[in-house]
């Protein structure tokens, strides 16, 4: 970014004159790294710490950030402010050291709110679909030449980054309800994709508390702001009378302000008619599979239409949409002959979905786009608490595939909970009689175990939010071939 562009940007961003260096604890996370990347491009000195290098830390290092792969008090010695994610414990030595010398310690969302304060903020919230919808909004605005800043929780494939600094007044950001930190944000426009029970430890196990928090978030909009909400979602429909702001509804429902009709899917592409008030219908070709992605697209189109973006830019952005990282990510087609000696090929897909609703949407998209394929899912449950709280839902949804390989629960720092483990879940699914799960407690044996079950024309879904994404990449790199030393699961 040149000096003239940076000077233009400063008209939208507070200069924080006394801030010398901004330190991020847990900087390798997508959300944290995205904000750090925007601030680095704005000219601020960035430092941060994490336990191991990854693509995010490498990107930041290339931008001049100082990254430490440890957590030590001396790492924050030059910091003016310390930014932390909800995943970082309060007894982290860097947080303790910062508080001892009175360096401000703030949440990630507080820094995002600072970026948004002097911009036209568009915040995308909801239990599912936030990351993809954020990328879709950013894609439309970029196609229209509006050069937005965006901060996303996942990789925006077209840009190759999680976040990007633009020169316009628009800031498009994923808003995280997992720790209720999205209440720091004060956007001009807010999208709510859906509301379901998740992260309930944040809300004391009280769903009413979660619903009220979403209402409070919407009331951060100015009175002239707008809420764009999916009326297909029963909880959103219930909450509409409590939202004291201008509302645009969207969905497949007949009473939606902006409706989806005549949805069709062919492979990884969807198409639908977008019906709107006071304007002609649009036939949208969407380069993303599934009815859930049609809903994400219409949310993005609703915001763009409200802003006055022309139909040509909207249609082109949706046609060329490249998706986000680990959202029905097609990793390729692989010949079986070197995998297990059989003829034919299989398709490998990686997907981040880890809530039953998300997993169900992925399965339905796969069934609709590839109806002749057998679905083979490798599923890694994420968190013991989520497995416990949504146990029956997981059992129901996972019974919808043809072959199921189950990895152990990815704990995300949680202690095991009796009865909320993968072995118990396999037993329950097996008892329902639709699929006979294969438990794979040792991930080293997965390639060999998977090779044993694969057949011609299979679609393999690598599903979950833990380490299963890295496993998917390794499988793709090896072309699904078990490597020497990898045992077979008996």
UniProtKB/Swiss-Prot annotation:
Gene Ontology molecular function: ATP binding; UDP-N-acetylmuramate-L-alanine ligase activity
Keywords linked to the UniProt accession: ATP-binding, Cell cycle, Cell division, Cell shape, Cell wall biogenesis/degradation, Cytoplasm, Ligase, Nucleotide-binding, Peptidoglycan synthesis
Superkingdom in the source lineage: Bacteria
EC number: 6.3.2.8
Predominant place of localization: cytoplasm
GO biological process assignments: cell division; cell wall organization; peptidoglycan biosynthetic process; regulation of cell shape
Signal peptide: none
The protein's annotated pathway: Cell wall biogenesis; peptidoglycan biosynthesis
Annotated residues for binding of ATP: 126-132
GO cellular-component term (any): cytoplasm
InterPro entries: Mur-like_cat_sf, Mur_ligase_C, Mur_ligase_C_dom_sf, Mur_ligase_cen, Mur_ligase_N, MurCDEF_pg_biosynth, UDP-N-AcMur_Ala_ligase_MurC
Catalytic activity entry: UDP-N-acetyl-alpha-D-muramate + L-alanine + ATP = UDP-N-acetyl-alpha-D-muramoyl-L-alanine + ADP + phosphate + H(+)
Subcellular location: Cytoplasm
Keyword Ligase: yes
Pfam family for this entry, one: Mur_ligase
Family in the record: Belongs to the MurCDEF family.
Functional description taken from the UniProt entry: Cell wall formation.
HAMAP family with a match to the protein in the record: MurC (MF_00046)
Name of the molecule in the record: UDP-N-acetylmuramate--L-alanine ligase
Classification lineage: Bacteria, Pseudomonadati, Pseudomonadota, Gammaproteobacteria, Enterobacterales
Gene: murC
